[in-house]
């Protein structure tokens, strides 16, 4: 299991962007699941698109996200939302998505928590 320490264990590049935008994948770029992508511009503004975990036994977690103020959640599959509770708890990130995505995500997080208890594996956002 990966235990994150907000701002301490991220592999996100520290160098500034001179121009254009940076796309940085925290997971999911070369695999199914474990999704997370940060888009950052040259002003340092960052936007995270999805932040999930692979639904394996035990789960596979993406790289730690750096601090982001906003995240877009595209849909409620666990490989796109599984790490969002950690993100919101660690950074107070504002989540953006449809009202249906919000409702289904809450159900999915409760189910993920229940399954983790039954199968005896901790979640990185489990406190």
Located regions from the model:
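Pre-active-site segment of Zn-dependent metallo-hydrolases
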Residues: 29-34, 38-73, 77-78, 82-93, ...
């Amino acid at each position: 299991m990966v235990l994150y320490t907000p701002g301490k264990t991220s592999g996100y590049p520290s160098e500034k962007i001179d121009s254009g935008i940076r796309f940085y994948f925290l997971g999911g770029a070369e695999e199914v699941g474990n999704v997370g992508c940060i888009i950052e511009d040259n002003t340092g503004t960052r936007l995270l698109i999805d932040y999930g975990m692979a639904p394996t036994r035990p789960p596979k977690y993406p790289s730690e996200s750096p601090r982001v103020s906003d995240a877009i959640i595209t849909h409620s599959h666990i490989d796109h939302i599984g790490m969002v509770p950690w993100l919101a708890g660690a950074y107070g990130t504002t989540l953006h998505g449809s009202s249906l995505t919000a409702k289904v995500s809450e159900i999915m997080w409760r189910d993920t928590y229940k399954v983790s208890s039954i199968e005896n594996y901790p979640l990185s956002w489990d406190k």
